[in-house]
Amino acid sequence: MAGNAGVAEAWTVSEATRYIKQLLEDDPHLPEIWIRGELSNFKQHTRGHMYFTIKDEGSRMQAVMFAGYNRFLRFKPENGMNVLIRGEINVYEPYGQYQFYAKEMQPDGIGSLFAEYERLKKALEAEGLFAEERKRPIPRFPTHIAIITSPTGAVIRDMMTTLKRRYPQIRVTLFPVLVQGEGAPLSISRALEQASMANIFDVVIVARGGGSIEELWAFNEEMVARAIAEAAVPVISAVGHETDFTISDFAADRRAPTPTAAAEFAVPDARELMEHIGHLKKRLERSLVEQVKTRRRELERLKRSYAFRYPVQLVHQKEQQLDGLMERLNRAMQIKLEQKTLAFKHMNQAILRQHPATRVSQLQKERRQNHARLVRAMAAETQRKRQSLSAVIQQLQLLSPLAVMDRGYSLVYKDEALVKTAKDVEIEDDIVVKLADGNLHCQVVGKREMKNGGESNG
């Protein structure tokens, strides 16, 4: 009977498997561990999942790495490769088989590479090879760029697309090199020397796409770092992804997170340049308009001041002074216009030396038209002000006492005071009679005052 009771309490295979699975999941050490071993029986499913065996001299274990994790791998796993994998041990219930579920994988032996990387980095840094004062500025408007990279692949295509889109007139020379493997450091160093000796480049870009630390190692070699530092022109390093830092990045004059970003650093955006030129043109026009307004206000002030404060005999002198001011104004405006035009021309030449000729011709034509309009406007304004001044002078001459005297009238002064009535003088007073063409010195011998329309003898 006891034997029958034990049979009644027997577990199913599924129950036993789930129990073992639960034990593994509850174990504090198994959910997150690192395992070192050799890959074998490696295969990748069409859906992206990787299935393989991880083994050493004494044992082996089935493992799987799902596509959601293995898409971040920076190397291609192969049979016989020694690796480090991180993940958890659990049970695959359908087969009652325990296996390793990998979340991260990297080639074993990277530790020695990192140690060599840190050693060389510290040595070159202590030597001053990475010092900021050694860094050279990247030219704003290069005409010829050298690119040192693999002649095939997406890197050179993406860079050329970016360069031609942003700055169509740029010239590019490709130095094809090995970017990984045993001969890569020497290939890259020789290309840098050739680019320096050519003496025709404004900037050099050293580029490579992403990869594992082993694939990028050529750019961590001392030979390459020194070739970059000794280059005759500024060097932009664009190796790997944004998170990758190589010795070449520290030795270069500028680091770009990606090859495409390096192309953007190397050349300006032609559209932005045209917008900048447009802004400068508007600023020039506003400056000229303000100068004209200022000179007009000065002219109005001079007109009001000179027309009413000075005697008529000074009008002609002030008219000459006004002519001088107008000449100075014209010269100043001409000089200002020439200075602005020359500065604008120099800027066009510096920025758009190789810009399409039709655009340059159009800008020059607009500048000439603006200049001609400004000159015509100033000439018309000057003529109008002269006519206005002549009219004011004629009005002043009509109101002048001297003009009245020309018609036969005279002024009588006694002791330099104007005599207005007969009561202002007495018999035997000396008086001065001022005529249009001279003065008469007289003595009063008699006077007759007018009273109520009649006469009275004095």
Curated annotation (Swiss-Prot):
InterPro entries: Exonuc_VII_L, Exonuc_VII_lsu_C, OB-fold_nuc-bd_dom. Keywords: Cytoplasm, Exonuclease, Hydrolase, Nuclease. GO terms for molecular function: exodeoxyribonuclease VII activity; nucleic acid binding. The keyword Cell inner membrane does not apply. Its EC number is 3.1.11.6. It comes from the Bacteria. GO terms for biological process: DNA catabolic process. It is found in: Cytoplasm. GO terms for cellular component: cytoplasm; exodeoxyribonuclease VII complex. It holds the Pfam family tRNA_anti_2. It catalyses: Exonucleolytic cleavage in either 5'- to 3'- or 3'- to 5'-direction to yield nucleoside 5'-phosphates. Bidirectionally degrades single-stranded DNA into large acid-insoluble oligonucleotides, which are then degraded further into small acid-soluble oligonucleotides. HAMAP family: Exonuc_7_L (MF_00378). Belongs to the XseA family. Heterooligomer composed of large and small subunits. This is Exodeoxyribonuclease 7 large subunit. It comes from Shouchella clausii (strain KSM-K16). The lineage of its organism: Bacteria, Bacillati, Bacillota, Bacilli, Bacillales.
